[in-house]
Amino acid sequence: MNHPKIAIIGLGYVGLPLARLLATRYPVVGYDKKASRVEALQRGEDTTLEVETNLLREVLTPTNPTLEQGQTGLFCTHTPDDLAQCNYFIVTVPTPVDKHHRPLLTPLQSASEVVGKYLKAGDIVIYESTVYPGCTEEECVPILEQVSGLKFNQDFFVGYSPERINPGDKLHTVAQILKNHLRLHP
């Protein structure tokens, strides 16, 4: 990664632990549309209890980190314009289901619209929300193209990475899973 600035879209059970871990090595902007959630995080309070207070406070920064080499930290915001300098976007919004157990894609579509507004040539978008096979290409990519005016696999790139955590599981955290993976696959 050449001067990455990572955006995490959705700071819930999946997004916040990932943002905290990445912020130990990279500049990270954590975006959540809920102002109350962001305000609590800015104080170092995680109401989901997924991230320990001391670990969260170690990486929090009160200002949006710049792309200066070596700068790290997590800036939490509910202002979409704070995503403008990011070049990697990881979408971790929830995908609830309706009463018939069909996925409600509204959060995913809204997140794709937000990302599309700030997408630039060469950027990478990774979806980590739980979705059915083909959803990324069928639902998300067209929104990114329409909003950004860019062309998928030509101007920007998209990937899918399934969730790597089990909310509430303090033993199998993102950091522990990555550590074990790197030890097994150097």
Regions found by a protein language model. Name each.
Residues N2-P4, P27, K33-Y88, P94-R102, ...:
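Conserved N-terminal Rossmann-fold NAD(P) cofactor-binding segment
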Residues L11-G12:
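Glycine-rich Rossmann-fold phosphate-binding loop(s) that bind the pyrophosphate
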Residues G15-L16:
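N-terminal Rossmann-fold NAD(P) dinucleotide-binding loop
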Residues L22:
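Aromatic pocket-lining residues of Rossmann-like dinucleotide-binding sites
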Residues D81-L83, Y118, T173:
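Structural alpha-helical scaffold elements that stabilize or flank donor/cofactor-binding regions
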Residues V97-R164:
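Rossmann-like NAD(P)(H) cofactor-binding subdomain of soluble oxidoreductases
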Residues T130-V131, V141-I143, N166-P186:
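Short beta-strand and adjoining strand-loop segment in the mid-core
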